[in-house]
């Protein structure tokens, strides 16, 4: 209810001039609200069961960003500077070590595939994590890379049987929205 109220208030203040938007827009707006509620519920559950705390959103990795570029020396003496933006950075501090993970929000079905990394593909998240590890981040000491995760940000569509109970349906929804990636093995 609260999320819908916030969305509706934002919509009225910023996106309309008071006129009706039509049934199709109303439907899409309700779907957006449901998606936001699903994502917020997952975030609340995630942080209730984790030592990680979100510490940065849209973190800039750039020569003038909060974290410097990730630099790769080239054979000709030049330098390849990789820059970008991290959706979310989480930190868990334990025994003087700052465990850092980067999270990328995905509206599609992106899955982490180590084979792609092996062949030099889909390395963006790892490079961002390495930039934070190598260049430092705020006042965190003894940074240890803890992982990269893709987080689906969609309201999952699940196929159900007519007589399926709510618990089974919720389990299917959770399976479709589970974060995936690679994490440090404790």
Where are these regions (language model features)?
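Structural signature of nuclease core domains in nucleic-acid processing machines
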Residues: 1-186
């Amino acid at each position: 209810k609260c999320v819908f109220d916030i969305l509706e208030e934002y919509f009225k203040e910023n996106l309309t001039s008071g006129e009706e938007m039509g049934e199709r827009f109303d439907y899409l707006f309700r779907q957006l609200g449901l998606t936001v509620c699903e994502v917020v519920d997952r975030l609340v559950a995630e942080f209730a069961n984790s030592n990680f705390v979100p510490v940065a959103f849209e973190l800039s990795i750039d020569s003038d960003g909060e974290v410097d570029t990730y630099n790769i020396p080239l054979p000709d003496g030049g330098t390849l500077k990789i820059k970008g933006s991290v959706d979310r950075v989480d930190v868990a501090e334990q025994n003087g070590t700052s465990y850092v993970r980067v999270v990328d929000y995905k509206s599609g079905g992106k899955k982490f595939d180590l084979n792609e990394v092996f062949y030099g593909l889909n390395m963006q998240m790892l490079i961002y994590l390495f930039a934070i590890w190598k260049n430092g981040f705020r006042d965190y000491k003894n940074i240890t890379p803890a992982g990269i995760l893709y987080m689906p940000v969609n309201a999952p569509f699940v196929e159900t049987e007519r007589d399926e109970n709510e618990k089974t349906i919720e389990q299917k929804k959770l399976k479709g929205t589970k974060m995936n990636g690679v994490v440090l093995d404790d």
